[in-house]
């Protein structure tokens, strides 16, 4: 119990006490309690004495009525008045005694109350712990009992149901030993066969041993030290026997023993076969181990018997008896060892079938706390009763809380008046603040509704034309395009999707402010995302002549699990800033594991210009992560990530203008820019880096930067993902479609800058091309001259080509051996040109304009080498055949006020065989969907003029409900309604609005699903498959 509860309780008691005091004092005043000053007025006349007495009484009554009526505060004049009153000393002492006695009683009651609460909590704790142990023991026993019963079916099937039997002692022993983990509570399993007296001689001859009596003549169990199977007597003559023929190794000593020769076992066996259920014995010392245990027995029948079979029928159908031996002491001890609190309480298990004489099955009589909890145990045998009794080992602790609380109440009583005054004042102030907050809350809710509606409207209006562009590009991908055209379309699609994601930043800002921004957990291709981001900035980098490059370490898995959209958003923001402020040099994006920080290219500080991508100096990269909390002060890792996690570190390095020192402290502040001229010169809102920092934090990472004015900036962030590679999936460095014609080819890269050469090596090896890097042209020619391997192409950087092209081409013209490889020029700008006169006598080089991307490289090499084989576009999602089977012949109505969206949606559905009808408004949709009609589904836009999709859907549902009532009342014929007894057309919302509130409104107005624009095959399949199961549904 917290201090606040104690104070609150004290305030309530103090208030009650103050009211009692007021009542006592009022009673004293009413009874004419006078001070000694009344004795001094003897000379005054009776009339004057009467007037003075009456006046005093009126003053006293006014004072105490004011106090008792308010009961909340004591004004300063009340203290003065109280001090002026001369009470009789005897009555004052009585009042003090009443005060003391009252609070002593309150303290005693408080002590008793808290002590009883502690005792109740102790009882509840004991009950919970005891019930938990009883439940675990009961559950584990039931599991073992079910497996024993299953073995009885196994015996019936493979021993008695097979001729010859498929089970012998060796097979049974091996099987039970290997499956013992399924019966953790049993110490052994044995099977006894039913043998009639007439069959005994033949049975003993077949088995090779004599049926022996289980116990001695005194019916006492044999001690483990005296146990000798040969010394046991043969079983006496009786009508039938139950000798054990199969036994687990742990109880193999019971083979040949007659289970009917023991009193307890005989009753157990007879009851099991007559009832058809599992039967338990009373606890008894087990043979040989002499430990306390029970035997669970199931009868094995010749055939399956109905549940209502009579005992006589069951006896006649009995083949034998399967028993499981449970060592009670061991199984309870093993159970308690699994619990961390096993030393806290004492556990006793009893067989209480005979309530007057319970049998202790487990436990000791160690003295403990007198508190006891009894939990029933149900072991499947209704005739035997068991229970678990639990007690605490330690005595209850001293009630410190009760003593401290009761003492505190006495102290609090002296401050009751002040506490009441402060409390009432606080309550009054809180009530006023609460009223103000209610008013502000109403205003905020109204503003939030308006804001949500505004975001929904603006989001829809902006997304509608953009989705039309993306939809048309998707339809264009289904036409006959060559590889280059496909690359152009993919680039346009990537740019469009990136634009939509940038629009989403406006919506994300609202989520960030409310703290509701969440990340997805999906499988994605990291290298593919980097290629898409490069496509966004390739045009601008080529126009500026800035080299844009990406390098991803081969130690980074091909597939990761995380939020690809947010990761792309971070990269887009950082690279967008770099391309905005960089006029020359390079922008270099690297992705490594954190483990590689101090290795080779990612561990260097890039202090030497020759080690950079473009040869220009850059900001110290290591300074961008030196303040990360994940690393210690000396730069080494201070943590070890868990094995399934992939901890990436991504750096975006540029040679731009840099960030002024005075502006670096506010770089991540929302809506803050370096200076007022930045927004005029370069544009932007100033929220990109702020959103990026928030997203990095959600990815369990950190972000930092290092910047030097007039040199450049390097932004570095970390992010934690999960490994998306399947266990059986082989590593494939090329995540683009595999072009088999490049496999086995070899290329020589001529570049004297190691960082830039490694980027070229990275991209070409993704296509399966083996790459050799040399710094000069002479070394490339020497490599060709050696001729150890065939070189298919020579890649030359434009910087080297401009400097050494004359000598290089002359040497190629002199030696025909040098003409076989294809020349490829790697340029940074689209304006790069090659003199035709210079290349006389040789094939002009293929020009590849950076940034390098796998799809662009593949398309250019296919065209330049003449080996291109156009592959059909790869569609993700479910196979087209599945969607075609679902939509073939379906009549579908599409409702949208935008003609472009109508064309896109109609084209997407017609591609899968649907019969599409278009409507431009909700009013027309209502007229087309008035029952009876022949439509199978409707795709409804939400925001439309005249009547939106919500209202149109409500009216459609009203028409269907009215028609269903008419059919039910017989006012409309089923034949006239297409043999339909109930009308409910699947209506799917079709909109670009992705706000959650809009989704909820769709379902509320009667829509059945939600499809975002433009259609994605996977989402379309997921929605329509809920309503269309097979083409036969159309016919029906």
UniProtKB/Swiss-Prot annotation:
Keywords: Cell membrane, Cytokinin signaling pathway, Developmental protein, Endoplasmic reticulum, Kinase, Membrane, Phosphoprotein, Repeat, Transferase, Transmembrane, Transmembrane helix. It is an enzyme of class 2 (transferase). Induction: Rapidly induced by dehydration, high salinity and cold stresses. Coiled coil: none annotated. Residues 746-865, 891-1028 form the Response regulatory domain. InterPro entries: 2C_system_His_kinase (IPR050956), CHASE_dom (IPR006189), CHASE_sf (IPR042240), CheY-like_superfamily (IPR011006), HATPase_C_sf (IPR036890), His_kinase_dom (IPR005467), HisK_dim/P_dom (IPR003661), HisK_dim/P_sf (IPR036097). PROSITE patterns: CHASE (PS50839), HIS_KIN (PS50109), RESPONSE_REGULATORY (PS50110). Cytokinin-binding is stable at 0 degrees Celsius but transient at 37 degrees Celsius. One of its GO terms (cellular component) is nucleus. Residues 163-389 form the CHASE domain. The modification Phosphohistidine is found at residue 460. Residues 30-94, 421-1036 are cytoplasmic. Its EC number is 2.7.13.3. The chain crosses the membrane at residues 9-29, 95-115, 400-420. The keyword RNA-binding does not apply. GO terms for biological process: cellular response to abscisic acid stimulus; cellular response to cold; cellular response to phosphate starvation; cellular response to sucrose stimulus; cytokinin-activated signaling pathway; defense response to bacterium; leaf senescence; negative regulation of iron ion transport. SUPFAM superfamilies: ATPase domain of HSP90 chaperone/DNA topoisomerase II/histidine kinase, CheY-like, Homodimeric domain of signal transducing histidine kinase. The keyword Kinase applies. Activated by cytokinins to initiate phosphorelay signaling. This cytokinin-mediated activation is repressed by the trans-zeatin antagonists 6-(2-hydroxy-3-methylbenzylamino)purine (PI-55) and 6-(2,5-Dihydroxybenzylamino)purine (LGR-991). It is a multi-pass membrane protein. Optimum pH to bind cytokinin is about 8.5 at 0 degrees Celsius. It catalyses: ATP + protein L-histidine = ADP + protein N-phospho-L-histidine. Residues 457-723 form the Histidine kinase domain. Interacts with AHK2, AHK4, AHP1, AHP2, AHP3, AHP5 and At5g43560. 'Oresara' means 'long living' in Korean. This is Histidine kinase 3.
């Amino acid at each position: 119990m917290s201090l606040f509860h104690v104070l609150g309780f004290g305030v309530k008691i103090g208030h009650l006490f103050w009211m009692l005091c007021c009542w006592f004092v009022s009673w004293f005043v009413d009874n004419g309690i006078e001070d000694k000053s009344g004795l001094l007025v003897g000379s005054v006349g009776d009339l004057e004495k009467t007037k003075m007495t009456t006046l005093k009484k009126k003053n006293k009554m006014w004072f105490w009525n004011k106090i008792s009526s308010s009961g909340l505060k004591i004004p300063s004049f009340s203290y003065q008045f109280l001090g002026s009153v001369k009470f009789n000393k005897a009555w004052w002492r009585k009042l003090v005694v009443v005060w003391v006695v009252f609070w002593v009683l309150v303290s005693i009651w408080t002590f008793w109350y808290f002590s009883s609460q502690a005792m109740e909590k102790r009882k509840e704790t004991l009950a919970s712990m005891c019930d938990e142990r009883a439940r675990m023991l009961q559950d584990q026993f039931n599991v073992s009992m079910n497996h024993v019963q299953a073995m009885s079916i196994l015996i019936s099937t493979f021993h008695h149901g097979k001729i010859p039997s498929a089970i012998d002692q060796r097979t049974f022993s091996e099987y039970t030993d290997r499956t013992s983990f399924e019966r953790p509570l049993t110490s052994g399993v044995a099977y006894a066969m039913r043998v009639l007296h007439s069959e005994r001689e033949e049975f003993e001859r077949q088995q090779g041993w004599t049926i022996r009596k289980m116990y001695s003549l005194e019916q006492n169990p044999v001690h483990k030290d005296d146990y000798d199977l040969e010394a046991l007597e043969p079983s006496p003559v009786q009508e039938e026997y139950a000798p054990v023929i199969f036994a687990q190794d742990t109880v193999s000593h019971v083979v040949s023993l007659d289970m009917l020769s023991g009193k307890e076992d005989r009753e157990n066996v007879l009851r099991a076969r007559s009832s058809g259920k599992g039967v338990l014995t009373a606890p008894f010392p087990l043979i040989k181990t002499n430990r306390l245990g029970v035997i669970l027995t199931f009868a094995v029948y010749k055939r399956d018997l109905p549940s209502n079979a009579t005992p006589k029928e069951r006896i006649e159908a009995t083949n034998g008896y399967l028993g499981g031996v449970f060592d009670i002491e061991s199984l309870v001890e093993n159970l308690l060892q699994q619990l961390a609190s096993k030393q806290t309480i004492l556990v006793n298990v009893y067989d209480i079938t005979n309530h007057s004489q319970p049998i202790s099955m487990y436990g000791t009589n160690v003295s403990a706390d007198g508190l006891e909890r009894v939990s029933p145990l149900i072991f499947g045998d209704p005739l035997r009763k068991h229970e678990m009794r639990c007690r605490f080992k330690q005595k209850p602790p001293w009630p410190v809380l009760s003593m401290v609380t009761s003492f505190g109440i006495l102290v609090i009583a002296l401050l009751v008046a002040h506490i009441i005054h402060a409390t009432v004042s606080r309550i009054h102030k809180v009530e006023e603040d609460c009223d103000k907050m209610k008013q502000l809350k109403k205003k905020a809710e109204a503003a939030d509704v308006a804001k949500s509606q505004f975001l929904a409207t603006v989001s829809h209006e902006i997304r509608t034309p953009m989705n039309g562009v993306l939809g048309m590009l998707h339809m264009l991908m289904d036409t006959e395009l060559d590889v280059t055209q496909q690359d152009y379309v993919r680039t346009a699609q990537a740019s469009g999707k990136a634009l939509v994601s940038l629009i989403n930043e406006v919506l994300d800002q609202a989520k960030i402010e409310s703290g509701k921004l969440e990340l997805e957990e999906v499988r994605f291709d990291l290298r593919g995302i980097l290629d898409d981001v490069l496509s966004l900035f390739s045009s601008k980098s080529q126009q500026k002549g800035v080299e844009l490059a990406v390098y991803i370490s081969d130690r980074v898995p091909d597939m990761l699990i995380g939020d690809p959209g947010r990761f792309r958003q971070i990269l887009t923001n950082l690279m967008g800033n770099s391309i905005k402020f960089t006029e020359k040099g390079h922008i270099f994006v690297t992705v490594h594991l954190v483990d590689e920080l101090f290795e080779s290219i990612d561990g260097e500080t890039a202090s030497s210009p020759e080690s950079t991508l473009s040869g220009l100096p850059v900001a110290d990269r290591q300074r961008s992560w030196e303040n990360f909390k994940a690393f210690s002060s000396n730069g080494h890792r201070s943590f070890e990530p868990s094995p399934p996690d992939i901890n990436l570190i991504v750096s975006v390095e540029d040679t731009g203008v840099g960030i002024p020192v005075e502006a670096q402290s506010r770089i991540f502040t929302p809506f803050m820019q370096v200076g007022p001229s930045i927004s005029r010169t370069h544009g932007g809102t100033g929220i990109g880096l702020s959103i990026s920092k928030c997203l990095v934090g959600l990815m369990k990472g950190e972000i930092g930067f290092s910047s030097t004015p007039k040199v450049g900036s390097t932004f570095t962030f970390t992010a934690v993902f999960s490994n998306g590679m399947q266990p059986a999936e082989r590593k494939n460095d090329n995540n683009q479609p595999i072009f088999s014609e490049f496999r086995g080819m070899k290329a020589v890269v001529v570049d004297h800058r190691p960082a830039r050469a490694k980027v070229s090596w990275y991209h070409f090896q993704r296509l399966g091309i083996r790459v050799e890097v040399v710094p000069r042209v002479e070394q490339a020619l020497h490599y060709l001259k050696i001729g150890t391997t065939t070189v298919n192409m020579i890649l030359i950087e434009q910087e080297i080509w401009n400097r050494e092209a004359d000598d290089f081409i002359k040497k190629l013209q002199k030696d025909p051996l040098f003409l076989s490889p294809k020349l490829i020029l790697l340029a940074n700008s689209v304006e790069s040109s090659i003199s035709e006169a210079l290349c006389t006598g040789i094939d002009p080089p293929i020009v590849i304009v950076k940034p390098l991307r796998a799809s662009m490289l593949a398309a250019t090499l296919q065209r330049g080498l003449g080996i291109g084989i156009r592959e059909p576009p790869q569609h993700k999602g479910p196979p087209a055949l599945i969607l075609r089977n679902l939509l073939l012949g379906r009549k579908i109505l599409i409702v949208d006020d935008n003609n472009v969206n109508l064309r896109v949606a109609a084209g997407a559905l017609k591609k899968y065989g649907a019969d599409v009808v278009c409507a431009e408004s909700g009013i027309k949709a209502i007229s087309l969907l008035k029952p009876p009609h022949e439509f199978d589904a409707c795709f409804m836009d939400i925001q439309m003029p005249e009547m939106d999709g919500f209202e149109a859907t409500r009216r459609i549902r009203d028409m269907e409900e009215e028609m269903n009532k008419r059919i039910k009342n017989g006012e409309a014929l089923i034949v006239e309604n297409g043999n339909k007894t109930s009308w409910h057309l699947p209506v799917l919302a079709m909109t670009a609005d992705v706000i959650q509130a809009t989704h909820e409104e769709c379902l509320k107005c009667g829509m059945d699903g939600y499809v975002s624009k433009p259609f994605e095959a996977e989402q379309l399949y997921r929605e329509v498959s809920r309503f269309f199961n097979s083409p036969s549904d159309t016919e029906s």
